[in-house]
């Protein structure tokens, strides 16, 4: 049985302490950042090492492409932001679909070959004129039809290669000009505007995993951010949208979460979270979190594992990935975009 936490590690290899604790506590997931990545062989060795210590621990990454890129120095991962594809779609719909397909195919090919199980995409926030740039650039735009078409291409590619998608940031990060990494966004948006933010989550409600937003939605819960809101996670997500998958938090070390560890775990338990994400890489902190899990019975009633990695139907070694890279680059050059 795994512990209901997704953790991070400090370097591009496991320290003795990390090896020991991963083996003992078996975290639900370990999320990789740029600091954990040097080259492809090193990543394969790292993911293999993690699996040897805890077979059921899933390897996560946030590899959206564009401004969120954990492979920044790798030529294989140089892609446009999602919002750029929305702009391209307005002029060349077929081209935009082809480019998103190629980007997704290439990304998932590498993630699968590196032993990565989960990618925290798609971003389903619906932007408007006030949306903070850090979020807007990561979306496929405000047109629901276009967004749905491009998101579906991205999601299907993930499943094709056995990489689980995680939709985010529920119930929507599009109504604020604040970045929850640095402060706690609070929105007074109307119920109508809030329901509009749910549109894409309804469309993709059958995806196996969802990440919450560290935002306070005054008209739904004027006390808690969505991550800690029973009304948002139980009444809206579970009852209204009938979501059956796994619910994980955004990173608890983000500035939008100003609660103590004890309070965070208590609120997470009451809100209906299944898994928490903590990217501190701090094992003293992780041990404290795990101790608080036991106090709140988080272990007993939250540890649902709803996903087991499917073996890809494709034989990775038979794919000429350079062909897909060349086609992507040729199309970009041909259309001058």
Feature-to-residue mapping (PLM):
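N-terminal small/glycine-rich loop or linker at the start of catalytic domains
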Residues: 1-4, 64-89, 126-134, 165-187, ...
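N-terminal hydrophobic targeting/anchoring segments and the immediately downstream early-domain regions
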Residues: 1-78, 332, 337
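Second-shell residues forming the walls of enzyme active-site clefts
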Residues: 7, 35-51, 152-159, 163-292, ...
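Short, acidic/polar
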Residues: 9-24, 99-110, 194-200, 260-267
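Glycine-rich tight-turn/loop motif centered on a GG-T
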Residues: 35, 77-97, 131-150, 178-195, ...
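Glycine-rich, aromatic-flanked loop segments that form ligand/cofactor-binding clefts
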Residues: 54-80, 100-126, 147, 151, ...
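Extended, intrinsically disordered, low-complexity segments
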Residues: 295-337
């Amino acid at each position: 049985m795994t512990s209901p936490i997704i953790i991070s590690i400090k370097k591009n290899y496991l320290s003795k302490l990390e090896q020991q604790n991963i083996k003992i506590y078996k975290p639900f997931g370990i999320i990789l950042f740029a600091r954990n990545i040097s080259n492809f062989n090193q990543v394969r060795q790292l993911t293999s090492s993690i699996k040897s210590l805890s077979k059921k621990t899933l390897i996560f990454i946030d590899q959206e492409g564009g401004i969120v890129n954990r492979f920044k120095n790798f030529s294989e991962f140089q892609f446009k932001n999602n919002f750029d594809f929305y702009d391209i779609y307005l002029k060349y719909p077929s081209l935009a679909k082809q480019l998103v397909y190629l980007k997704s195919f290439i990304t998932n090919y590498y993630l699968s070959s590196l032993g990565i199980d989960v990618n925290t995409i798609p971003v389903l926030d619906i932007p408007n004129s006030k949306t903070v740039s850090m979020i807007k650039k990561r979306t496929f735009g405000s047109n629901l039809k276009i967004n749905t078409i491009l998101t579906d291409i991205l999601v299907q590619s993930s499943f094709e290669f056995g990489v689980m998608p995680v939709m985010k940031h529920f119930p929507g990060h599009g109504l604020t000009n604040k970045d929850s990494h640095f402060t706690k966004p609070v929105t007074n948006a109307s119920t109508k505007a809030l329901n509009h933010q749910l549109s894409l989550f309804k469309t993709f409600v059958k995806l196996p995993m969802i990440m919450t937003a560290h935002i306070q939605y005054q008209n739904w819960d004027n006390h808690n951010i969505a991550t800690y809101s029973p009304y948002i996670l139980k009444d809206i997500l579970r009852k209204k949208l009938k979501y059956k998958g796994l619910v994980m938090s955004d990173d608890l070390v983000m500035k939008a979460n100003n609660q103590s560890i004890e309070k965070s775990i208590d609120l997470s338990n009451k809100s209906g979270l299944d898994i928490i994400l903590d990217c501190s890489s701090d094992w003293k902190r992780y041990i404290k979190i795990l101790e608080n899990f036991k106090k709140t019975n988080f272990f007993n009633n939250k540890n649902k594992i709803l996903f087991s990695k499917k073996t890809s139907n494709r034989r990775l070694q038979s794919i000429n990935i350079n062909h897909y890279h060349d086609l992507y680059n040729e199309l970009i050059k041909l259309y001058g975009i």
